[in-house]
Amino acid sequence: MIPSLFTKRSGGPAAPQFPKIREGQICVTWIGHASFLIQMHEVNILVDPIWSKWLKVIKRLKQPGFEIHHLPSIDFVLVTHAHFDHLDRRTLRRVASDQPIVVPMGVGNLVHDLGFHIVHELDYWQTVELGPLKISLTPCHHWGARFLADLHRDFGGFVIAANGRTIFHCGDSAYFPGFKEIGDRYNIEVALLPIGAYEAPTGREVHMNPEEAVKAFVELRAETLIPMHYGTFRLGFEPLHEPPQRLLAAAREHGLEQKVLVMTEGKPVVL
């Protein structure tokens, strides 16, 4: 991890060209790491936004896909858990504009003072309706403490549904049998799945490797797999370029390569 401190950041933000979304379409823009802008049914949703250059002592090695001031007006913000690479208070304070934010149970006190209109804390399988959206919190296999003594904080993924379209942001998770139940409960079309940090310095099994992400995708019965949570911060010992290569190889072995969409930061894709 130490050599990363001296590694020059790659990439460079550019003004994104957000397309006009037609009725029934979903536009997904990967900002980097687990951060996404999701546009559907005339609303803009920001998930796990982080524009910061450092996670305490961990350096950001890939620039965000675009600058924060290029964001459209954000209607709703979702945060999957309290870890610093997902809940970045500095970024949240900049995007807060009196809109609702949705977090797992026990995370609300970390965001209540940042400028959001209302904080919705969800329990597992609970749903909140925000405008045209139905947003549900799903379980995952991870952990939620921001510091050593706050083990009460929940963590999870979000299913976002509107107008017959459904997208799933997994948050952080190791592989676990619960993916099948998530697939049984929701008709997921697009699955945003983490594929990095599987060679964790702690040795804890709290992140999927790329092969397990393919297995989770199959059990979710989704139509498109978009990988995330790799290439931005060095959170594991694996090479930064390795996760998407292994993912495509595993998908090819299962005849699923055409269902994998490896995105470029800052480049919107309409589905």
Task: Locate predicted features.
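Glycine/Thr-rich phosphate-binding loops of Rossmann-like dinucleotide-binding domains
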Residues: L55, L87, V111, A145, ...
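Short active-site oxyanion
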Residues: Q25-C27, V95-I101, R165-I167
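Metallo-beta-lactamase
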Residues: P3-E23, V103-R165, Q245-L271
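Active-site-proximal beta-strand elements of phosphoester/diester hydrolases
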Residues: C27-W30, I45-D48, K134-C140, T166-D172
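Pre-active-site segment of Zn-dependent metallo-hydrolases
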Residues: G11-K20, I31, L37-A82, R89-R94, ...
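Divalent metal-coordination and catalytic microenvironments
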Residues: I38, D48, H81, D88, ...
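Active-site metal-binding loops of divalent metal-dependent hydrolases
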Residues: D48-S52, H81-A82, T138-H142, G171-S173, ...
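Cap/insert and terminal regions of metallo-dependent hydrolase folds
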Residues: F76, P100, G106-L110, F176-T264
